[in-house]
């Protein structure tokens, strides 16, 4: 009987035509087999229920992941659209033509490390025959940074046209930007005034990497001077001014 039960045939009942102790043994085997079969049926039903529950959970989780993925794709599409808009704004800000005159020729090129940077530059003719030269970099990226870039450029250029010294222009621009900076952005700026009549370059630096001066023999050196606080951090900052000929 034991080999029969071990083979899984638990619905088999042992038939013994005797009244001795073998009958009791057979009866016990039959009882155990019936109980064991009932227990296996319960376990099988529980496993099927758990399997169904697990499949339902997997399907629900898969649906959630699909929704999350769709939401992420939508967010990414909006981010890319914003970056493209900011990129177009940046291109519109950068000048396409520069002033030229006796003793000065201006050229510019920019190679960004990322698809969108916060760099901008400008050269403007001042009323007294000198030229204002601006190189700057706004923190952050996206439309907000591009807008702050436009505000910074306009603010600095408006002040530059007054003909004030580079240190004065940066100080006034900093105070103005600190008043209109809800996102706490900042801009590093190198601003210089070049006088083609004397060959003198006066400049001030607000947190920007040092400018490089290339000599007629091709050698390049950093312009000496301090690197003061970037614009937009805090108001009432004094900027140091330097000059070279």
For the regions a language model picked out, list residue spans one by one.
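Amphipathic coiled-coil signaling helices used for dimeric signal transmission
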Residues: 3-4, 17, 21-49, 53-67, ...
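HAMP-domain connector/hinge
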Residues: 11-22, 111-112, 125
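Flexible, glycine-biased helix-capping/connector loops in cytosolic signal-transduction modules
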Residues: 1, 7-11, 102, 129
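Extended hydrophobic/Leu-rich segments
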Residues: 2-7, 15, 215-218
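The cytosolic transmitter module of two-component sensor histidine kinases
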Residues: 10, 18-25, 47, 102, ...
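… and, occasionally, acidic/histidine-rich disordered N-termini of signaling adaptors
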Residues: 64-245
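Leucine-rich amphipathic alpha-helices with coiled-coil/heptad-repeat character
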Residues: 5-9, 36, 43, 50, ...
């Amino acid at each position: 009987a034991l080999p029969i039960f071990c083979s899984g045939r638990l619905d088999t009942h042992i038939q013994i035509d005797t009244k001795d102790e073998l009958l009791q043994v057979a009866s016990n085997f039959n009882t155990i087999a019936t109980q064991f079969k009932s227990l296996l049926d319960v376990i099988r039903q529980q496993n099927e229920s758990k399997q169904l529950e697990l499949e339902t959970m997997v399907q629900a989780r898969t649906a959630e992941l699909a929704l999350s993925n769709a939401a992420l794709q939508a967010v990414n599409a909006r981010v890319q659209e914003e970056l493209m808009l900011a990129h177009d704004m940046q291109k519109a800000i950068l000048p396409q033509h520069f002033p030229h005159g006796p003793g000065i020729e201006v050229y510019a090129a920019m190679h960004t490390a990322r698809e969108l940077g916060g760099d901008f530059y400008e050269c403007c003719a001042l009323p007294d025959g000198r030229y204002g030269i601006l190189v700057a970099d706004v923190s952050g990226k996206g439309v907000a940074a591009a807008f702050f870039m436009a505000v910074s450029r306009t603010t600095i250029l408006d002040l530059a046209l007054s003909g004030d010294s580079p240190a004065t222009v940066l100080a006034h621009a900093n105070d103005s930007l600190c008043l209109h900076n809800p996102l706490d952005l900042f801009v590093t700026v190198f601003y210089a005034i070049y006088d083609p009549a004397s060959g003198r370059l006066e400049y001030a630096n607000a947190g920007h990497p040092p400018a490089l001066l290339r000599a007629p023999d091709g050698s390049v050196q950093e312009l000496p001077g301090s690197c003061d606080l970037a614009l937009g951090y805090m108001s009432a900052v004094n900027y140091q001014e330097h000059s070279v000929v």
